[in-house]
Structure formats: C-alpha cells, structure tokens
Amino acid sequence: MAVPKKRTSMSKKRIRKNIWKKKTYFSIVQSYSLVKSRSFSSGNEHPKPKGFSGQQTNNKIFE
C-alpha cells in the first residue's frame, strides 16, 4: 500500500536552499574572474573579433 512521504521541515528546506545559493554564487564569481583575467591578459578590455586586422583605411577625398 502506498504511504505518503513525510513533510520536509522548513529548516531543512532553508539549509538546502542556502547551499544551492552559495554554489551558484561561487560559480558566478569564478566565471567572472576568468573572463576578467582573459580580457586583461590580452591587454584590451574588449577583445577584437576574429579576422580583424586592425588596419583601417581613411576614405576621405582631399582637394
């Protein structure tokens, strides 16, 4: 015969929720620091897209 589960206490719910929040917070901090270190290692805060040579031509006509 099927028996219903016991109800989880509020304190257990709170503890489990806090553990989950801490894990997500630390993963966000870790990923942010990784992105920050990569952008500073290249010497540019906004890295250039692939295939960008960096040379731009000036198309102004001088009279």
From Swiss-Prot:
Region feature Disordered, mapped onto this chain: 39-63
Question: Per UniProt, which keywords does this protein have?
Answer: Chloroplast, Plastid, Ribonucleoprotein, Ribosomal protein
GO MF annotations, alphabetized:
structural constituent of ribosome
Q: Which GO terms describe its biological process?
A: translation
Q: Where in the cell is it found?
A: Plastid, Chloroplast
GO CC entries: chloroplast; large ribosomal subunit
InterPro entries the UniProt entry points to: Ribosomal_bL32 (IPR002677), Ribosomal_bL32_plant/cyanobact (IPR044958), Ribosomal_zn-bd (IPR011332)
Q: Where is the composition biased (Polar residues)?
A: 53-63
HAMAP family attached to this UniProt entry: Ribosomal_bL32
Concerning its family, UniProt says:
Belongs to the bacterial ribosomal protein bL32 family.
> Which named protein is this?
Large ribosomal subunit protein bL32c
Q: Which organism is it from?
A: Triticum aestivum
